[in-house]
């Protein structure tokens, strides 16, 4: 079990923890063993289904009155998984992990076992410059871009002809530098199922979309941009909440992660 889980769940439930991604979701606790923690207070039962158990389901254990469910399973990095949730009405639905760090390529929606990536950063000079930056006294020019349509091969196959994060290092960064911009602002890069939404209907709040590569690839892009003297701004849209039945809406059989009002103003 994660060290100090009971104490941490107390902090979470009392609103005293602000880095829940370090606990919730899937994390490798030892080589070949992963922990799974999910908040679903109204669920009757939760199982983890994935490549590591032939999608048959391994039950999680309810953690008292915390609303959380926890378990540890033998699994390997890169394998896919979902939660099978039995709601208060007895209906069962497969759901994505709200804290997944990565997902399979569309049209699939399973989360992928990935811990927070670690890369070698080269942007010390940029960070030092940023700490001294005077935003109201120095030039600021922002290039806003939707990476999925910046350069795209419309005749490509099932991969959609998307640029990769590496392509963006090679093509986008020099282009923006040549134009004289100081920052790149991305339209939402978090995981989303529908291309036409431009990323504004989120499913993975903690995962850069797999359309362009894995999370480590994205970090390398940010590093390369900083080395080139460019800041990165992310358009993050937590209010745009996808309602697909296998995602976050009615997650535990109730709108526990969503407004209870059916008004279209409250969610998308």
Predicted regions and their residues:
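Conserved, mostly hydrophobic/aromatic
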Residues: 38, 83, 145, 186, ...
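The feature marks proteins involved in alpha-glucan
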Residues: 1-33, 55, 63-144, 149-160, ...
